[in-house]
Amino acid sequence: MQREVYVSITGLRVRRIWHIPSFWSLATKAMVQARSAPGNISAETRTIDGVHHTRSVWTDKAAMQAYLTTGPHLEAMRRYPTIAKGKTVGFLTTEVPDWAQVHAIWVEMGRDV
């Protein structure tokens, strides 16, 4: 049996074209933070149908939550409502979804944030 990991999937759409520079500045800093955060196994991005997605894999939910509430990601969450809209979903699994699955899971199970 494989080890269980926590997968977090986000999908965000920038509200207005003039928000793009702020969005990418915040997103880039948050991704750098994620990739070096304790408990992070992987963190990747893709744009699918104009939606900016992330898929991050963590040793456990606590590691993801520690990242979520500190540093650049916390700043991004504070600014998020004014520059973007989207959905997130997180779950425990023994199989990390591929990108086709990521998008389907996000569409089906994502909750508005």
Spans of features found by a protein language model:
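Short S/T/G/P-rich N-terminal loop/turn motif that feeds into the first structured element of a domain
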Residues: 1-51, 65-66, 87-113
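Ligand-binding pocket scaffold of soluble enzyme catalytic domains
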Residues: 55
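An amphipathic, aromatic/His-enriched active-site/gating alpha helix that lines ligand/cofactor pockets
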Residues: 59-90
